[in-house]
UniProtKB/Swiss-Prot annotation:
HAMAP family: ATP_synth_alpha_bact. Belongs to the ATPase alpha/beta chains family. Its EC number is 7.1.2.2. This is ATP synthase subunit alpha, chloroplastic. The keyword ATP-binding applies. It is an enzyme of class 7 (translocase). ATP binds at residues 170-177. It catalyses: ATP + H2O + 4 H(+)(in) = ADP + phosphate + 5 H(+)(out). Its main location: plastid. It is a peripheral membrane protein. The gene is atpA. The keyword Transmembrane does not apply. GO terms for molecular function: ADP binding; ATP binding; proton-transporting ATP synthase activity, rotational mechanism.
Amino acid sequence: MVTIRADEISNIIRERIEQYNREIKIVNTGTVLQVGDGIARIHGLDEVMAGELVEFEEGTIGIALNLESSNVGVVLMGDGLMIQEGSSVKATGRIAQIPVSESYLGRVINALAKPIDGRGEISASESRLIESPAPGIISRRSVYEPLQTGLIAIDSMIPIGRGQRELIIGDRQTGKTAVATDTILNQKGQNVICVYVAIGQKASSVAQVVTTFQERGAMEYTIVVAETADSSATLQYLAPYTGAALAEYFMYRERHTLIIYDDLSKQAQAYRQMSLLLRRPPGREAYPGDVFYLHSRLLERAAKSSSRLGEGSMTALPIVETQSGDVSAYIPTNVISITDGQIFLSADLFNAGIRPAINVGISVSRVGSAAQIKAMKQVAGKSKLELAQFAELEAFAQFASDLDKATQNQLARGQRLRELLKQSQAAPLRVEEQVATIYTGANGYLDSLEIGQVKKFLVQLRTHLKTNKPQFQEIISSTKTLTGDAEALLKEAIQEQLELFLLQEQT
């Protein structure tokens, strides 16, 4: 017969009582009143914070944007087709954040930092808030290092520095994305991490950009954040902030980063759609009143860190699309006032075969020559003024029948200068090659050539310099100055190549 030992039983009961841990969990919940068009109205959620993530019964995540007296307006991060009226919603107590790590390099992700390239999960041990405050005044220092784009027109006349915000603005189909992607291609070997954010674009266009990066070996140092035209407005609105959070992760690790937002017009449209559906009062062009803040808080995150923070940098190249060259529309004027300069691309120049179609007259960099190496300052100092004068003279010359010799010479020089600024897509030039090219044009060595021969001659000259005068590139890259020795080598190479070229053309 089994004997029951009272002391043993009491010990077991005591142990169980000691182990018992009652967890009290307060969950902030609400009920769906209505849902549709990517917006849900929720009754309840009394303790919810602005910008807090909420989770619906069937798993969809949303962001609480409108906190009203009778309900909460939530924007959905999915299609929300399975959400039903009356279903429950709970507040998560978190605001939007994404995982970050070095493993993101070379990957294509969406606005929630989930991979969409079919290459498996991305490991990350750390996370960053999608919206984080921009560095303060003390945390910054002025821009002084150049960020080379590989495009002669930009690096010589509208230079961009590390930590600058430079707007690329123009009509559709004027080569805005091409300027941005060429800049990424030119960062190879420069120790710059690039983030390309595609907002509301065609999936085929994004695929084309990714293919170009892969073929040119640029994906090794690039992250692509893509929310295509069929994505919800919420995700298109979030994509630039996700890209900025990834770039910041590297910036605060004392690295240099370049981020491209392609394009902010589409983000503003997505935000307008969300705001109107949430019944926020519309302002100019039906955009909400805080659309300026939408872009300013994003672009202010680009900075050049102070020496105390390790001198990392985040350079932003936002793209904005204009309608028939109207730079005075709402979004273009907003972004122009936030950025440190703009590169204006003209449809007329593009159609005239001048590519990149940069209108040098109204493009400007507010950092200026602080973001150029000394060699570039030496050769490109007067070229912007010369080109502006040439454009004015060219317009006048259309009406004048007989021009004096000096004017004819100035026109001929201007035409050759404009010709040397032309570049094929995905063919960025090293800064040493740019210095040689501009020096050749600015010092009249191209005057003896026909306009149609200029491009061919310059290609041959750059090859000649690379193979026969490698010391020239070494001097420029080590001293960053066009020294007397470098100039002598360059003059020699130009004379040799000019004689050879003219001989070839005669035969």
